[in-house]
Amino acid sequence: MLYLEDYLEMIEQLPMDLRDRFTEMREMDLQVQNAMDQLEQRVSEFFMNAKKNKPEWREEQMASIKKDYYKALEDADEKVQLANQIYDLVDRHLRKLDQELAKFKMELEADNAGITEILERRSLELDTPSQPVNNHHAHSHTPVEKRKYNPTSHHTTTDHIPEKKFKSEALLSTLTSDASKENTLGCRNNNSTASSNNAYNVNSSQPLGSYNIGSLSSGTGAGAITMAAAQAVQATAQMKEGRRTSSLKASYEAFKNNDFQLGKEFSMARETVGYSSSSALMTTLTQNASSSAADSRSGRKSKNNNKSSSQQSSSSSSSSSLSSCSSSSTVVQEISQQTTVVPESDSNSQVDWTYDPNEPRYCICNQVSYGEMVGCDNQDCPIEWFHYGCVGLTEAPKGKWYCPQCTAAMKRRGSRHK
């Protein structure tokens, strides 16, 4: 998955190439303009002295002026060809970028179906200014902590909280607010009530305890990012203060390799079922999360016997409250039996680049514009632009050039006049 690095390496020389070609075009433009100025002066002198000189002189001067005009026209045509080459160069790089994006998207979809849509939406949200609700959510702990000022010790309680911790809380609060928007009012109340008893009984005094699976379980709409964040909060709540982290990338990798086995339920529910199936899916996720948390603490049952029993009772109450939001639990079983693997044939077919059907067609091959192309100098040519390979050219022609159809038509007209 080094598409970005490869593409950046590929376009590393593009600015220099464009600068050189634009410089060459500028020089040619100045050359054409100077030639046109000189020709205009010669034409004015020719008409001033035409009556004073002999017809032979007039014909000679007229032929010389016409020759210089044709040379200036060839230089202008060459400048246009250079502009077309620059356009094709940039267009090739744009098409290559689209191809690499399509491959990267397919690679992400193969691992987690629907993840690209979530990432694109998250990127758009990051590009836009943050909402006032999210800002209030992200910094809701700061004013409270600042008021806890101890005049005797002359320091605040936030001095020991790392800066990364606030950033992680802001990220998780954004996920929480997005998840709450996608859920309905009834299930949101049940989820928050049920899961508040079991998500963070390990260390409820920590600031991260306000984020739990109930607040993040928005169904399949939040996707893998939401569940990865939920698992990260659960994992970091049990760590020491100095080892806590909420890295979304690490959480997502841990989420993929964990024993939750969520691939089938999460990916297929977004496409096949509605609200009831997503609620039933989150019931299964909460049960798995609480059971895995209980298994991880089985080695120290003797020390935390009371804590384990309270978490088991709260897990059962959470399961019952979450189950009331779904119409049937059999939907989850049907989802788990379905597969989310992208077929290999579909993957290969999507890698091949398909042009826009609305893009205009050129040349005798009736294909879109690509590579180097040459234009027919016949103003009435129905095709106008041709690929070099289709008309047997390897370099830009000098002077005027006519396509095979126009050449044949001109020959036919010439034979008729004879």
From Swiss-Prot:
SUPFAM superfamilies recorded: FYVE/PHD zinc finger
Family matches, as CDD domains: ING_ING3_Yng2p (cd16858), PHD_ING3 (cd15585)
Binding site for Zn(2+) 1: 363, 365, 387, 390
GO cellular component, one term: nucleus
A GO molecular-function descriptor: histone H4K16 acetyltransferase activity
Chain intervals annotated as zinc finger (PHD-type): 360-409
Ranges of Basic and acidic residues composition bias in the record: 156-165
Site location (Histone H3K4me3 binding): 362, 373, 377, 385
Subcellular location: Nucleus
Positions with a binding annotation for Zn(2+) 2: 376, 381, 403, 406
Record flagged with keyword Metal-binding: yes
Family listed: Belongs to the ING family.
Pathological condition linked to this protein in its record: Squamous cell carcinoma of the head and neck: A non-melanoma skin cancer affecting the head and neck. The hallmark of cutaneous SCC is malignant transformation of normal epidermal keratinocytes.
The name this protein goes by in its record: Inhibitor of growth protein 3
